[in-house]
Swiss-Prot record:
This is Formate hydrogenlyase subunit 6. GO terms for cellular component: formate dehydrogenase complex; membrane. It comes from Escherichia coli (strain K12). Residues 31-60, 66-95 form the 4Fe-4S ferredoxin-type domain. Probable electron transfer protein for hydrogenase 3.
Length: 180
């Protein structure tokens, strides 16, 4: 009996005083994902990578905005969103105490303004994403990037229409052999 008491005293405290002081977690711990809306460009790469569909985006044409939503209740803390984010706007934190009183507290939302096409005036992309692409080109030494802003702010459909050759200008007979 004395040997057991001696061993307990020598070992010390076996449990932590958790509610009173936080538990230390490993540096590679994957906790609650946190999104920085100022850094996010609304590219939706995280939405495509999320296996549990915890991230969603919807285009609201009435307001001209892209609605980004993160549901923490669906998250499996895999870290794919953090890996694919081009601007490092999503980081997995060390936070593990995620209990809430209401389901609505599990939701994080951000809204991003859409860019309207310069030709057809329909929204097609997030303005921050276009600005980010131009800034990235400038950073990599392309001095003409700002000059091509009009092209960046034109939707793919209008670009295709601009590049099409009218059918009355196509001469089909030049590719055919003459019949004898």
């Amino acid at each position: 009996m004395f040997t057991f008491i001696k061993k307990v005293i020598k070992t010390g405290t076996a449990t932590s005083s958790y509610p009173l002081e936080p538990i230390a977690v490993d540096k590679n711990f994957r906790g609650k994902p946190e999104q920085n809306p100022q850094q996010c460009i609304g590219c939706a790469a995280c939405v495509n990578a999320c296996p549990s569909n915890a991230l969603t985006v919807e285009t609201d044409l009435a307001t001209g905005e892209l609605a980004w939503e993160f549901n923490l209740g669906h998250c499996i803390f895999c870290g794919r969103c953090e890996e694919v984010c081009p601007t490092a706007a999503i980081k997995l934190s060390q936070e593990y105490e995620l209990a809430v009183w209401k389901k609505e507290d599990f939701l994080q939302q951000s809204r991003f303004a859409l860019c309207n096409c310069r030709v057809c005036n329909r929204p097609f992309a997030v303005q921050k994403e276009i600005d980010y692409a131009i800034a990235l080109l400038k950073h990599n030494g392309d001095s003409r990037a700002e000059n091509h802003r009009e092209s960046f702010e034109t939707c793919p459909e209008c670009k295709r229409q601009k590049c099409l050759v009218p059918s009355d200008r196509i001469e089909l007979t030049r590719h055919m052999k003459e019949a004898i």
